[in-house]
Regions:
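The feature captures two recurrent sequence modes
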Residues: 1-101
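Short charge-dense sequence patches
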Residues: 2-22, 110-118, 143-147, 172-184
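Acidic-enriched, low-complexity/disordered segments with a strong bias for Aspartate over Glutamate
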Residues: 10-12, 29, 36-38, 53, ...
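Intrinsically disordered, low-complexity regions
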Residues: 12, 17-18, 90, 102, ...
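Intrinsic-disorder-associated interaction segments
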Residues: 50-67, 110, 125, 180-184, ...
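Helix-loop junctions and short alpha-helical segments
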Residues: 72-157, 190
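Amphipathic, oligomerization/interface secondary-structure segments
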Residues: 129-270
Length: 270
């Protein structure tokens, strides 16, 4: 598996993705796994080669939080059903060499990515097959992508979406692409006018009162999210040759056409 792994980090997740991430976790850098608990049930763990040489619990948590933020960003983009949900919560750090838990450290809020992901080297020997780990390795190859998925790890609101929009425009300027966003021009105009306008969003607007007229057709948060996330998906395909996976370990059922009375009777018999 991973070379020189020293720490296992206990992680909580409320979204039943442990088995998906714990299986087929062959990789050369960062991964999750599950173990049976002594008192029943299963525990969820994470580790990374990027923390193996560290000794400070504070440094380990700080670095691991940034790495896990990338996975959080992946799930935020793929799973559009929950805004601002924490898919991963760090609990404890266990030193495998000394067989002891490190002192608990209060998790600090991460404002930006400053971990050097370039030290992660893809290995043919440990080439990932799980689509989440494949996507993670692709993200780690480019600083723009690591920052993008860090931004995605934050609560979905107008401010978060606008920062992502700004970052995408900045990236497009660096590659002198002036046309990529043209198909979205009308919707982006509605989005920016909505996000900036205090009369529409109040405290949640990007600006205070400016005297500008509110947009004639404000775009709600759900549609704003889908707009920016669709742009991200197309950007990944066209600029990085990255296709997002169709399945990521979470299953949803559409109950709109289900006879709920009949379903209730069936469940009683199970």
């Amino acid at each position: 598996m991973v070379k020189n792994i020293r720490y296992s980090i206990e992680v909580d997740s409320k979204f039943h993705i442990e088995n998906f991430l714990g299986n087929n976790n062959n990789t050369n850098d960062s991964f999750f796994w599950t173990e049976d608990h002594d008192h029943g049930g299963r525990q969820f763990f994470f580790t990374s080669s990027l923390i193996s040489d560290m000794n400070s619990a504070t440094e380990i948590i700080y670095t691991a939080s940034q790495i896990i933020a990338i996975f959080q960003g992946i799930y935020t983009l793929l799973d559009r059903n929950r805004n601002g949900s924490n898919y991963f919560t760090i609990r404890n750090v266990y030193d495998i060499d000394s067989k002891r838990y490190l002192e608990k450290v209060q998790s600090t809020e991460i404002y930006k990515i400053d971990v050097d992901f370039s030290v992660i080297v893809a290995s043919d020997e440990n080439k990932p097959t799980n689509p989440i780990y494949i996507l993670f390795e692709e993200i780690c190859k480019d600083p723009f992508l690591t920052n993008l998925f860090f931004l995605l790890s934050n609560k979905v609101d107008y401010k978060m979406l606008y920062i992502i929009y700004d970052d995408i425009r900045f990236y497009l300027r660096t590659i002198n692409d002036k046309t990529f966003l043209n198909p979205y021009k009308a919707l982006l105009n509605d989005f920016t006018h909505t996000a900036n306008n205090y009369e529409v969003l109040g405290f949640y607007a990007r600006h205070g009162r400016t005297g500008h007229q509110p947009p004639s057709a404000p775009i709600n948060l759900e549609n704003s999210k889908n707009l920016i996330f669709d742009i991200i998906g197309n950007l990944l395909i066209s600029k990085f040759n990255i296709t997002l996976p169709d399945y990521w370990g979470m299953i949803y059922m559409d109950f709109s056409s289900v006879d709920l009375v009949q379903l209730k009777d069936i469940l009683k018999k199970v």
